[in-house]
Design a protein with these regions (language model features):
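Glycine- and aromatic-enriched mobile tails/lids
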Residues: 1-5, 22, 36-37, 45-50, ...
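An anion/pyrophosphate-binding glycine-rich loop and adjacent beta-alpha core
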Residues: 223, 229-340, 344, 398, ...
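A glycine-rich dinucleotide-binding beta-alpha-beta segment and adjacent secondary-structure elements
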Residues: 154-174, 181, 326-379
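Conserved redox-cofactor binding core of oxidoreductases
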Residues: 95-187, 199, 244-249
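N-terminal Rossmann-like FAD-binding beta1-loop-alpha1 element of flavoenzymes
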Residues: 7-31
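Glycine-rich active-site loop/strand segments that organize a redox cofactor
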Residues: 51-82
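Glycine-rich FAD pyrophosphate-binding loop
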Residues: 24-46, 55
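Short hydrophobic core segments
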Residues: 8-10, 191-200
């Protein structure tokens, strides 16, 4: 079955939804999402979204903080674009009804690791969920946006799929949409579009321990790679220093670790070894407020040195009412797991959290393949370099989704709409449901291998072993 549209968007996180909203102002949109429309990495983002709001803050300071965190590998122009356009994109969120937490008449701006100023807008500790709510409401109100839920993108439509041709991937020059699996009935749709946007989010589920939901399996990276699209900086996987340590199995925990937000350390949380000793002063002068990569490596080193499974995050010295007010979700979730964070230390471990690399795009979200755009975590804009600054991810997604939408408008207005005859999906050589056990076992092996050998601290020996096993 073939369906035609102006723009196909793959993914329903902040990047995909915001791009859809803006593109709908001039074109018809089909948005496909792997599960339900609210299931995305955005929905699990707790801490907030960084932007220069405080009059005492400045673009220059935010840019500098981002460049420092990125370890000299950021694209300064990309960083400056994100930072300078950030306040306008925050206004866009406010206009569609996003409710950020306030202190009096002003926004309650938090400070997180690596930031020199308080510039994190948040909605308690459920920021991503609130942004997702506002975006979904706005998108659903648009008659020219059609959402397909439980629809899994399989592969991009390129020259390789032209009827009557047998092109190699190296000859791919255009993208005309994608093959989409309707998981409710097993049918594969061919969605043909003038422009396609990949906004599929991250790949944390490639690792044994991750803060990402089950859907974050790196589909967008893989599709682009198979189509010959340029990919970059994939070695830079950010590990969040503090995910909740649980003795539950992977299935019991729904396949991902509960995130203990960066904002908890910004609020004054202290890291302690299992015997109660503070240790961050041994690693960085900023202690608990050092960037994520430094804190994650410090915790990893302490765990390996002592043979422990976790360290503690301590909030017990802070006012109990303020803790509950600032972190209602973290408080209630930990309480369900037997930890009262106002009185007890929180057991935490690092977990795979964010991909700093991805599909290489320019400042307008255009990939190396004509008609193919990308935005959000699946991309390499150059903003994050080797390490993302806390709360820059939602900002980058917003700014570059907006730029992406503007670029597509110009492209559609000025380009030919001649689309070739494209082949229907051919499932020969694929596994059937009767052989699902083979897939399940392979997934387990990959996750364990990636965690053991391609984790926080790597060596040539470990990487070579991982390559052989995979």
């Amino acid at each position: 079955m073939s369906i035609k549209t102006d723009v196909l968007i793959i993914g329903s996180g902040i990047a995909g939804l915001f791009a859809a909203l803006k593109i709908s102002e001039y074109a018809d949109v089909i948005l496909v999402t792997k599960k339900n429309k609210a299931e995305s990495n955005t929905n699990y983002a707790q801490g907030g979204i960084a932007s220069v709001i405080d009059p005492n803050d400045s673009f220059e300071k935010h840019v500098e903080d981002t460049l420092i965190a990125g370890a000299g590998l950021c694209d300064k122009k990309a960083v400056e674009s994100m930072v300078k356009e950030g306040p306008d994109r925050i206004k866009d969120l406010l206009e569609i009804g996003t409710n950020f937490t306030k202190k009096g008449n002003d926004f309650d701006l938090a400070k997180e690791g690596g930031h020199s100023m308080s510039r994190i807008l948040h909605a308690k500790d459920l920021t991503g969920k609130e942004i997702e709510r506002a975006l979904i409401n706005s998108v659903e109100a648009k008659e020219n946006i059609k959402i397909y839920e439980n629809a899994i993108a399989i592969d991009l439509l390129t020259e390789h799929n032209i009827s009557g041709k047998s092109e190699s991937l190296s000859n791919n020059k255009n993208c005309w949409g994608a093959y989409i699996l309707d998981s409710s009935n097993g049918e594969v749709l061919k969605i043909i579009a003038k422009a396609t946007v990949i906004a599929t989010g991250g790949l944390g589920q490639v690792y044994l321990h991750t803060t990402n939901p089950l859907i974050a399996t790196g589909d967008g990276f893989a599709m682009a790679y198979r189509a010959g699209v340029e990919i970059g900086n994939m070695e830079f996987i950010q590990f969040h220093p503090t995910s909740f340590y649980s003795t539950k199995t992977n299935s019991e925990s729904d396949g991902h670790s509960f995130l203990i937000s960066e904002a908890v350390r910004g609020f004054g949380g202290l890291l302690r070894t299992k015997d109660g000793n503070l240790f961050m002063e041994n690693y960085d002068l900023r202690k608990e407020l050092a960037p994520r990569d430094i804190v994650a490596r410090a915790i990893d080193n302490e765990l390996k040195k002592r043979g422990d499974d976790f360290v503690f995050l301590d909030l017990t010295h802070k006012n109990a009412n303020e803790i509950v007010d600032h972190f209602p979700n973290i408080y209630s979730t930990c309480l369900k797991n037997g930890i009262d964070i106002t009185k007890q230390f929180i057991p935490v471990v690092p977990a795979a959290h964010y991909a700093c690399g991805g599909i290489v795009v320019d400042l307008n979200g255009h990939s190396s393949l004509s008609r193919l755009y990308a935005c959000g975590e699946v991309t390499m804009t150059g903003v994050h370099g080797a390490n993302r600054l806390a709360s820059n991810s939602l900002l980058e997604a917003l700014v570059y989704a907006y730029r992406c939408a503007n670029s597509i408008k110009e492209f559609i207005n000025n380009s030919s709409t001649n689309i070739p005859e494209l082949l229907d999906w051919d499932d020969s050589g694929t596994l059937t449901y009767d052989e699902k056990v083979l897939i399940t076992q392979s997934v387990r092996e990959v996750k364990q291998t990636m965690w053991d050998y391609v984790g926080i601290v790597r060596s040539n020996l470990r990487l070579e072993r991982a390559e052989r096993r995979i």
